[in-house]
Every structure is written in structure tokens, then in C-alpha cells.
């Protein structure tokens, strides 16, 4: 196994600090692939790619995802397969491009968008399709409710280029939690997707939990009812025209928008998860990736969920009854993918027959959101 050493390069002109992981040439014989970007603190990023390029790679950073190498700043040259970047504007969204000496490159950013007032906002970009393309970064974002955004959060939203937000919440949810707090130049499109029956069920569950009475919660969610509700919720939506019309409107909004679009519900996991599955499916992203993205909400909602569990436990409520409704599982979204393929005839037919998207809109989505082959 090759050994690695660390060297520090200070770029005073750019106000940046790089920690460059240098490894032997044996580990850098392939083009840079699978660039993974994480951020442990504001303005600081860790970049890791599976293989270094032809001995060395150049690293670029930009706030526009289209072409960081041409439009951004050069961070430095790395002889290896990882680097740390510090000193970037914490309120901007940064995209990184790694280019080897043969000109092969890859672009990526953090999946998660760190905000103080929302926990589950994510970039939908970077996912690979079955035909070898990938979803472009920085054009579509998914999230939880945006009604608690701070001034800094709003600046981050603006800096990310988001100019349209689709809110899947119903009137009662907006009345309870508040309207989205977004910059003045962001258009909010209210598109409720839950039918009256589903909304009534959600209200009944909320009322049971608010009662603080373990017996009432057991009556509503016990006997496997919570699991049944959870596992059938998304797939049942496929047969509800009003809900599908709402998702269709969101897809048209994405296709027609000249800037980035974000969509969200309350927790950013069920309605938003279904919307993301529909979008990624139309784009040709494999089932496994769609499922992985769906359950990723568990990572970002974990802290809030734990607070809820602690509170309910203090009331004597069995939190295991609630977990199927609070946490995402493959069994919630895989039936959606199976039904679209097996009963609706695949994504093309489902998009046209159920979502009522014409061929031009489908083509526009793919042209706008996918890299070229």
C-alpha cells in the first residue's frame, strides 16, 4: 500500500489554505472520479476522489457549477487524491472541479446545504444515470420547510441562485408553521399535493401525539398501523390525480425555469422524497440511487427526530410506534418504482399518461438537468 504525506500550501492572494494529500504515483494512474465533497464547518471543505489523475490534478472552486475551471478560482495543484480547502465565503455555495494533466475532469459539491433554520435541504445534482450521464449540480434542490430561515440562510439561498421555491404544504400547515421566509427575489409557488383524506389522517396523528395520551397514540398507530400507513403512503399517491397534478406542475416549473428551483414540504422526506424519486426516475437514475437519496433524510433529520422521541418518551408514549412515520425506509419508495415500471409501463409512459407531461417537457428536463454523453 502506498504511503501518503501531508504538505501545506498557503495562497495568500486568494486567502485560502490547502492541506494537500500527496501519494505515490501508483495510486494516481487513473482519471479523477467519484469526487466527494464534505464540509465540517462553514467555509471549510474536504475533497476526496477515487483516483488521482496523471500524477497531478488541479483543483478549482466557483460559486457557479457550470465551469469552475473557467469561471472560478484555482485553489492549487494536488499530487494525490484528497485535499482540504479553507477560507471560502461561508454564505456561498461552492462547486469544485478536479482536472488531471490529460484534461479529464469531474465537478461536485456538498450534497447538504447547511442552514440554521432548515435541516434537510440538499442539492439533487451529481447522481449518475444508467446511460453514463449525471445530474447537473446547482439546478434543483430539495428541502424541508423554509419558514424559519435566518437572514444568513436567506443570503445562502440567494447566493445559490435559487429563484423559485415550490411549497408542497397545505394551507393548514402553512398557517401552523408560517410561510416560507425567502429573499424578495424568490418566487414561491404553493402547490399542495395531499388529498383531503391523507391530510385528515395526518391531522389525526398530530392530534393524537399532541394529546400526550399513550392510549390514544396506541389506538391510532398501534397494531402495525404506523408501518402500514408509512409503506403505502407514497405508492398510493400514484393513483391520486390531484396529487400527481401537483408534482407535474413542479416538474414543469423546473423544466421552464431559467434559474435554480427548490421544492419542499414540512420535513422534506415524504412528499419531497416522492417528488425527487419522480424527477430522478424521469432522468434515468437507477432505482438504488433513488432509494439511497430517499433514506438520506434520516441523516439530516436525526437531531430533530431525537428531540421528538425524547419529548414523547417523557410523556410515556412508545416512540417505536412513531418511528415508521418519522424515519425513511426503502420499503416506502421501492414500491413506487416497481409500480411505475410494472403497472404503468415504465417512466416514459408514466410521465405522459399519469403526470400528463408532453414529450417536449420531458426532453427539456433531460436537456437542462443532465450532462452530455
Give the residues covered by each predicted segment.
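Bacterial N-terminal signal peptides that target proteins for export
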Residues: 1-12
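Extracytoplasmic thiol/disulfide redox context detector
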Residues: 10, 17, 242
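Non-catalytic accessory regions used for complex assembly or targeting
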Residues: 12-14, 92
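C-terminal motif of bacterial Sec signal peptides marking the signal peptidase cleavage site
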Residues: 19-22
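Cys-dependent protein tyrosine phosphatase-like superfamily
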Residues: 24-261, 274-373
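Catalytic nucleophile loop of clan PA
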Residues: 264
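Ser/Thr-glycine-rich phosphate-binding loops at phosphate-binding pockets of nucleotides
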Residues: 267, 271-272
